[in-house]
Amino acid sequence: ASMRDIKRRKASIQSTGQITKAMKLVSTVKLQKSRQKAEGSKPYFDLMYETISSMLKKSGTIDHKYLRAGATDGKAVIAITSNRGGGYNNNIVKLIAGNEALTPEKTRVYAIGRKGRDGLAKKGYEIAEDYSEVIDEPAYQDAADLTKELLATFGRGEIG
């Protein structure tokens, strides 16, 4: 290899290093934003949990159709993964596929993220709904739509 080739190769490696460093910075910022959102919702969740627990303690038993076990053995799973690769996505797929109660024949998957959707579809799971487009910018309305779909499916007796 000539000196020119070596210099070109060195420049290429340095350029790749700069790109990698920039990508790490971007992912760090995204992680921090996600962490802030999650931590910001924790007080709300804690208060809701306290409120519901208090109501249940004071009221005794509550008979509501959504609190009773369904008449079917059909199940629903919300699989939250990313649209890009990574070990987390594989672990979610393995967790669901490895659960004996969540067989592909009896389980509908509501996929949030392409990697979970694709991985579970390959394992034979029915993808009831695909919400992969919401993973980058999740909004309240997306959660409300998914909740309505799940409650309607439960109400029809398709999952229990």
Residue positions per predicted region:
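Conserved loop-to-helix interface motifs that mediate assembly, gating, or partner/ligand docking
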Residues: 1-160
